[in-house]
Design a protein with these regions (language model features):
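Residue-level marker for buried hydrophobic side chains located in beta-strands
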Residues: 177-178
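Conserved core of the PLP fold type I
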Residues: 9-172, 184-203
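Walker B catalytic acidic pair
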Residues: 181
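N-terminal low-complexity, Ser/Thr- and acidic-residue-enriched intrinsically disordered segments
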Residues: 1-2
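Conserved catalytic and ligand/cofactor-coordination microenvironments
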Residues: 6
Length: 204
C-alpha cells in the first residue's frame, strides 16, 4: 500500500518519536505511524480484506497492560459492571483467568474449554457447538478469546468463527468480543474477529 506524505512532516514526526521530547495530546498513536499500523493490521489480521473504514487504535506498553486498561475502561464506561456475565475461552493467557476474579470486577465467569478430540483421542483444541451456543444468552455481556490459543497455538476453526459471528449478528448483537490475536501473524491467511464483526470487537 502506498500513501502520500509531506516529507518534512514525516521526518519531523520520526525525529520527535526518536527523541521522545513530548507526548501527543490527546494520547494517541502519531499520525504517520498510525497509517502504517492500519495497513499492517489490514494485512495481518484481515488477510488483506479489511472492513470499510479505519480502526480506532490505542497503543500500550504491553499485552498485560492492555488487558488492565481494557477491563478498567469497560467498567468505567459502564459497558461491564460488577456481577455481569462473561465467557472466557480456555486455555487462555493467565491474566485473563486471574483479572476477572479481582474484587474490583467480580464478573460471573463462564469458562468454555477447547476439549474436542479426534477419533484417535488426540486433542483438536477446538470448542463444541453446544458451548459456543451459550453465547446466545443476553446475560453474557462479553467474550474473551485468545486466537490462536495460548499455549496450544491453534486458531479457531472456520466453523466456530462463523458460528460466533452468526450469534452476534442474529442472537446477541450487544455481545462484546475481546480477542487477543498476538499470534495471528503465525497463521497463514489469518482473519480476526475484527475483520468480520469490527463493531463488536476489541482486538489486542
Amino acid at each position: 500500500m502506498q500513501h502520500a506524505a509531506v516529507p518534512d512532516s514525516l521526518v519531523h514526526e520520526w525525529a520527535e518519536s526518536i527523541v521522545g521530547d513530548q507526548y501527543p495530546v490527546p494520547d494517541r498513536i502519531l499520525h504517520f505511524t498510525e497509517i502504517l499500523v492500519q495497513d499492517y493490521l489490514s494485512q495481518e489480521m484481515c488477510d488483506n480484506r479489511p472492513p470499510r473504514g479505519a480502526y480506532d487504535l490505542f497503543a500500550t506498553e504491553g499485552g498485560t497492560a492492555a488487558m488492565c486498561y481494557i477491563f478498567d475502561s469497560l467498567q468505567e464506561n459502564f459497558l461491564l459492571n460488577k456481577g455481569d456475565g462473561i465467557v472466557l475461552m480456555v486455555p487462555a493467557f493467565t491474566p485473563y483467568i486471574e483479572i476477572p476474579q479481582l474484587s474490583r470486577y467480580q464478573f460471573r465467569v463462564t469458562k468454555i474449554h477447547a476439549n474436542r478430540m479426534n477419533n484417535e483421542g488426540m486433542h483438536l483444541w477446538q470448542y463444541s457447538d453446544e458451548d459456543i451456543d451459550r453465547l446466545k444468552s443476553p446475560k453474557i455481556k462479553a467474550l474473551f478469546v485468545t486466537n490462536p490459543s495460548n499455549p496450544p497455538s491453534y486458531t479457531l476453526s472456520p466453523d466456530t468463527m462463523a458460528r460466533i459471528v452468526s450469534i452476534v449478528r442474529n442472537d446477541n448483537p450487544n455481545l462484546m468480543i475481546i480477542t487477543d490475536d498476538v499470534y495471528g501473524t503465525f497463521s497463514p491467511h489469518f482473519r480476526s474477529f475484527m475483520a468480520e464483526i469490527p463493531y463488536n470487537t476489541l482486538c489486542g
